């Protein structure tokens, strides 16, 4: 079963991360993070300088060099630990998935007609296009599409949800996933991929990070960080030569050591964000996995953070999706109780949510209870797509209910009359966003049942929050424009696309993209595939077809259309976290500059004492304090990098102002306080 991590850490994860921290000291791995590679080289150099100092070749006091060397190694290890702990969360999820994936015997058949002739083969021998039969109690050995039959399937190994789902041939519920189990009946499945290419294989690879590539934003930020590091490297290297020149000019001894300058370089380089950058990206992917969403790339998550157009399906996302009877509206002087009675009689054999709600409404409003008509020679008329109505013939009466067009046709063909009053009420209900069902008895209209598609509680507030963030919401529906406009107004969406077709959705996405917008949408059917392939963030439902899943760049394992809003929030949280910690890291440099530069060169330039605003005890204590802070701030920020900066539904300008205040100003003030405190402590302990 897919596990969800509720806590950031556990003992097993920490032990594995600590072990991996040392494994990551491999130079090839360190080279992947250029900023931390500089710290890695500085750690090696200070270690060599310490060994030299033991043989009398002194750059500084051996104890000072040893302290600096240990702290620099800790800085590298802490960075490795941050990345390893983020990867560990993914590995834990991958282990749970791998336990559900095992080689099993499959029942391969030649064709549906000869399904009784079964050959047993290992699941690893199955190839794309093979037909397999899976019976109750058996595990589905490979991904595919149901081409015959229907069955109840337990997908808890993938989704974590214990409730079984129906998978059947045809339509948008035909896709099945290897590793899931058939609970009842049997199905014939056409295998959709070769070994190693299954949905489960992709999930394991993604959550382990095996196929994770740096996103364009990550690469751009890393280029900035490397550029800053190179600048500081050049500056630090030139400082040694300049200090030698200045000491000769002033006739004083040059107290600036290579160890001190290496410590200065590490403190001034953006090591905090350099250490946490990879962990932030991995953690963003992990948070998405915990939300039961599989992203095909980190780029998709970042795009979710930049999205400014959300295309949302009405049914299931904005409305509850099951229309409920809310009112009986008599016409042409008909009695409302007679209308309710006729409506209930015509719905007694109707097992749809709408039919059951009509029976309940008649009982609640008029005390009319359901009756057993099986012994009364009642003849129930089932709803069909052709007639678009249902009903009952009972005690010589013909009762029908259905769409206005179908009932109008039915009664006019039998010499009845469809009044203007009825036409007006039908139009009025449609304008309000409801669905009118007309009820007729013996070719005479009694009235209308007002079916209301209930807008989900709280969606209007959600859309208002999204609007504040600069995100435009568009409702996609197959309803007529009048109904769509009414529901759109009630839900508070910015726009809508009524009577939506696959071509209409695709063209709308293209139009928005031409104007520079980033578009997100959800889909589950083969007809959604073109639009999903075009969208910047395309979330396919796990219950959807193989074509939809292949077209999307994310798959929602819970198949919940509302998940798109959560995905956008996770994407924005990822970008906010990266920006906040970058701001904090660069702001830190200001305090570290004032901590190290004045004490380091005060012997050459006494005037620099004015810049020693922290009044640190000595050059050695100042450098040690700054390096200690530089190392341990990484550990303190790991929980924030993994959990993410708290997300708020406010405008981009307000978010920017808040983050500049908290992480910019905070990034300047925090090191001043911490470095001064560390300086006092190490002086009291007599370390320097």
UniProtKB/Swiss-Prot annotation:
Family: Belongs to the cation transport ATPase (P-type) (TC 3.A.3) family. Type IA subfamily.
Location within or outside the cell: Cell membrane
UniProt EC number: 7.2.2.6
Signal peptide annotation: none
GO annotation, cellular component aspect: plasma membrane
UniProt name for this protein: Potassium-transporting ATPase ATP-binding subunit
Residues at the active site: 313 (4-aspartylphosphate intermediate)
HAMAP family: KdpB
Pfam families: E1-E2_ATPase (PF00122), Hydrolase (PF00702)
Record organism: Clostridium perfringens (strain ATCC 13124 / DSM 756 / JCM 1290 / NCIMB 6125 / NCTC 8237 / Type A)
């Amino acid at each position: 079963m897919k596990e969800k991590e509720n806590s950031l850490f556990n003992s097993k994860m920490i032990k594995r991360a600590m072990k991996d921290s040392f494994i990551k000291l491999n130079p090839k791995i360190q080279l992947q993070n250029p900023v931390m590679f500089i710290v890695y080289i500085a750690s090696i150099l200070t270690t060599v300088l310490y060994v030299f100092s033991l043989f009398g070749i002194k750059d500084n006091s051996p104890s000072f060099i040893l302290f600096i060397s240990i702290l620099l190694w800790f800085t590298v290890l802490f960075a490795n630990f941050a990345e390893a702990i983020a990867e560990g969360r993914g590995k834990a999820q991958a282990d749970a998935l791998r336990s559900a994936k095992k080689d099993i015997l499959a029942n391969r058949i030649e064709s549906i007609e000869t399904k009784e002739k079964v050959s047993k083969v290992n699941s690893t021998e199955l190839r794309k296009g093979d037909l397999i039969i899976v019976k109750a109690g058996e595990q589905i050995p490979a991904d595919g599409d149901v081409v015959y039959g229907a069955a109840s399937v337990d997908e808890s190994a993938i989704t974590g949800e214990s409730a079984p789902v129906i998978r059947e041939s045809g339509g948008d519920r035909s896709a099945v996933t290897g590793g899931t189990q058939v609970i009842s009946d049997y199905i014939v499945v056409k295998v959709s991929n070769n070994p190693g290419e299954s949905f489960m294989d992709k999930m394991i690879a993604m959550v382990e990070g095996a196929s994770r590539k740096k996103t364009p934003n990550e690469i751009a930020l890393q280029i900035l960080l490397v550029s800053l590091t190179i600048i500081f490297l050049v500056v630090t290297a030139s400082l040694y030569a300049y200090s030698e020149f200045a000491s000769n000019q002033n006739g004083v001894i040059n107290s600036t050591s290579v160890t001190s300058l290496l410590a200065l370089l590490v403190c001034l380089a953006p090591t905090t964000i350099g250490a946490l950058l990879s962990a932030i990206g991995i953690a963003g992917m992990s948070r998405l996995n915990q939300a039961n969403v599989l992203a095909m790339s980190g780029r998709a998550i970042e795009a979710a953070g930049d999205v400014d157009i959300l295309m949302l399906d009405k049914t299931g996302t904005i409305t509850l999706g099951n229309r409920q009877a809310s009112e009986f509206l008599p016409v042409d002087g008909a009695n409302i109780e007679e209308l309710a009675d006729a409506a209930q009689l015509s719905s007694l054999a109707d097992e749809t949510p709408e039919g059951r709600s009509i029976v309940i409404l008649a009982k609640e409003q008029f005390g009319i209870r359901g009756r057993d008509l099986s012994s009364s020679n009642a003849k129930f008329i089932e709803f069909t797509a052709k007639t678009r109505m249902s009903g009952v013939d009972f005690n010589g009466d013909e009762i029908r209910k259905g769409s206005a067009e179908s009932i109008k046709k039915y009664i006019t063909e039998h010499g009845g009359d469809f009044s203007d009053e009825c036409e007006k009420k039908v139009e009025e209900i449609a304008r309000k966003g409801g669905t009118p069902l007309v009820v007729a008895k013996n070719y005479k209209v009694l009235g209308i049942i007002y079916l209301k598609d209930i807008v989900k509680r709280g969606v209007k507030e959600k859309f208002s929050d999204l609007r504040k963030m600069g995100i435009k919401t568009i409702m996609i529906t197959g309803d007529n424009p009048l109904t769509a406009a009414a529901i759109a107004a009630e839900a508070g969406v910015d726009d809508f696309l009524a009577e939506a077709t696959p071509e209409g959705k695709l063209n709308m996405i293209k139009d928005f993209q031409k104007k520079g917008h980033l578009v997100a949408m959800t889909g589950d059917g083969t007809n959604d595939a073109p639009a999903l392939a075009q969208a910047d963030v395309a979330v396919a439902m796990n219950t959807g077809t193989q074509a939809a899943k292949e077209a999307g760049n994310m798959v929602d394992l819970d198949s919940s259309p509302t998940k798109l809003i959560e995905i956008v929030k996770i994407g924005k949280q990822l970008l906010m976290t990266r920006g906040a910690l970058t701001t904090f890291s660069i702001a830190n440099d200001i305090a570290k500059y004032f901590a190290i530069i004045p004490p380091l060169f005060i012997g050459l330039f006494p005037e620099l004492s004015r810049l020693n605003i922290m009044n640190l005890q000595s050059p050695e204590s100042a450098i040690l304090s700054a390096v200690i802070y530089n190392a341990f701030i990484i550990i303190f920020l790991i929980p924030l990098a993994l959990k993410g900066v708290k997300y708020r539904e406010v405008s981009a300008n307000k978010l920017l102002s808040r983050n500049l205040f908290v992480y910019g100003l905070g990034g300047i003030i925090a090191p001043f306080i911490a470095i001064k405190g560390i300086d006092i402590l190490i002086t009291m302990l007599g370390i320097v």
